[in-house]
């Protein structure tokens, strides 16, 4: 997608040349500040009842008198903020996408700040993404190729910054969605490793992939215990973005990469098990964040760690009651083989120590309990570090990718006690998302750490089934906030 900024004013929108003109309106319908042809058709439409001034409402007009653009769409935003602006742009694109429009101009009756410009890029990317890798019958790609954001001259510089940031994040979100949407027989650990190696062709990114033998040498007994039930070879993927001095401690992103999760011997119910291809959503978000960072080139060092394998039942698979030894030396009683994400993450969290990180953030589709607690709108955020938690919450707000902080009280650790190992891998149904985070916390004593449980936000079910690409916007904004 070609995103551009054009400095103009709302008093001359009728003269803009484009295949279609999308105008986001909000506030008082009589105070939109549009030039005469557009103000007149808007007023007439409202008076006739063709457009109710309510959030989400749209109106399509073909060749309105006195307007250069062949098509005009009005989209009503609930308020003047970037979230409402994004929703309105998305609604307008829903009308425009089937029309074969190649060049769309987007304007607003109110101010367009950098956050609005970023939101416009996100809305356009979401609207034009379509999965077709394994679906030859999928609809053709939308014709839309170019979006010009119309802003006042005084807004142009900030809008360009936001649009560039939004375009970069959109590339990352698209990569994360594409990886996560691949079926499990296509998206294997080897596939994720290959996608990571593609990123190494971009500036400042290096990639190394550790195989089973290398992981054995490192003592990653917990990760390899999960992997041993599958015929697919495990991969431990290490990405580095070197944007600052070597002496600068990096941000480390750790993404859970279970490319298919049957539950193992503690096998899942058949219903909706197909959605367990999305259990590598954390890994996808790390790859997507690196794609965005490579585009933006911030002055910060970033490391990505992706432990990737399948969780399968077989004669070699781990069993309930087995005890495994993690890379940290701590032993774990595997009470439920379907709580495997934490078993692969704990070794990655120990491996992260070698980078002497500024902060470590792990991202995982970890628990159904988090979905019960928070639904599908906010990711669960766990951290004992108030400053880090606040920074991540701010990043989520800035990227329209919100999270909600959950508790990590020491008392929850009691649930993980085991008579046969240093800890159990589950703590019962009560507070399941919290006890999962408490398990991970046991491997993070040497650095500042946060955990994002994205089980409710990494994908959608039902008619709109598909990966969301979250939390790439949150992670990218967080990395940018660390720039010197």
Swiss-Prot record:
Active-site annotation: 268, 342
Enzyme class of the recorded protein, top EC level: hydrolase
An annotated GO BP: proteolysis
Gene Ontology MF annotations: manganese ion binding; metalloaminopeptidase activity
GO cellular component: cytoplasm
EC number: 3.4.11.1, 3.4.11.10
Cofactor requirement: Mn(2+)
Residue sites binding Mn(2+) 2 per the record: 256, 261, 279, 340
Cofactor note: Binds 2 manganese ions per subunit.
Catalyses which reaction(s): Release of an N-terminal amino acid, Xaa-|-Yaa-, in which Xaa is preferably Leu, but may be other amino acids including Pro although not Arg or Lys, and Yaa may be Pro. Amino acid amides and methyl esters are also readily hydrolyzed, but rates on arylamides are exceedingly low; Release of an N-terminal amino acid, preferentially leucine, but not glutamic or aspartic acids
Subcellular location per the Swiss-Prot or TrEMBL entry: Cytoplasm
Record keywords, A-Z: Aminopeptidase, Cytoplasm, Hydrolase, Manganese, Metal-binding, Protease
Pfam family, one: Peptidase_M17_N
Residues annotated as binding Mn(2+) 1: 261, 338, 340
PANTHER family per UniProt: CYTOSOL AMINOPEPTIDASE, LEUCINE AMINOPEPTIDASE-RELATED
Record-linked NCBIfam families: PRK00913.1-2 (NF002073), PRK00913.1-4 (NF002074), PRK00913.2-4 (NF002077)
Described purpose of this protein according to its UniProt entry: Presumably involved in the processing and regular turnover of intracellular proteins. Catalyzes the removal of unsubstituted N-terminal amino acids from various peptides.
Assigned protein family: Belongs to the peptidase M17 family.
Name of the protein in its database record: Probable cytosol aminopeptidase
Gene: pepA
